[in-house]
C-alpha cells in the first residue's frame, strides 16, 4: 500500500476480519517526521497497534527520496516501507541488526538513507 499519507485512516477503517486475511502486508508510511505532533502520533500509534495485533514487523526500509529528519536527537525517515507478516506465519528469529539488507535498494541514486539504529536496537542496554 502506497497511498501518500492516507494509509493511516485506511488501516483504521479496515475491518479486523479483512486485515487478518493478509499473510503479508507491505505499507509505505508517510509523514513519520510528524511523530512529535500529538494528534499525528495518536493516529499513527492507533494504526500500528491495529496491525501489530495480528502481524509482526519484519523489515523497515527508509525511502531515501523523502530524506530523514532529526528531532530531539532522534533520526526519523520521513517515509519508510514496513513489511509485516501475520503472526501464524512467523517464528521469532530475533531482531535483525544488519542494515541495509542485501535486498534493500535506494529509491533514487543519491542521498542514501540507512535505517537509523534507534529503530532496531535495544535502547534499554
Language-model segments: which ranges?
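Active-site segment flanking the S-adenosylmethionine/decSAM binding pocket
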Residues: 1-45
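Rossmann-like AdoMet/SAM-dependent catalytic core
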Residues: 31-125
Amino acid at each position: 500500500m502506497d497511498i501518500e499519507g492516507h494509509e493511516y485512516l485506511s488501516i483504521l477503517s479496515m475491518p479486523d476480519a479483512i486485515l487478518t486475511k493478509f499473510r503479508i502486508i507491505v505499507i509505505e508510511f508517510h509523514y513519520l517526521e510528524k511523530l512529535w505532533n500529538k494528534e499525528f502520533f495518536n493516529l499513527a500509534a492507533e494504526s500500528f497497534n491495529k496491525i501489530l495485533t495480528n502481524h509482526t514487523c519484519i523489515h523497515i526500509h527508509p525511502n531515501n527520496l523523502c530524506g530523514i529528519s532529526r528531532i530531539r536527537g532522534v533520526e526519523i525517515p520521513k517515509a519508510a516501507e514496513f513489511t509485516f507478516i501475520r503472526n501464524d506465519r512467523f517464528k521469532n528469529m530475533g531482531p535483525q541488526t544488519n542494515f541495509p539488507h542485501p535486498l534493500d535498494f535506494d529509491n533514487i541514486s543519491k542521498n542514501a538513507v540507512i535505517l537509523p539504529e534507534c529503530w532496531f536496537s535495544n535502547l534499554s542496554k
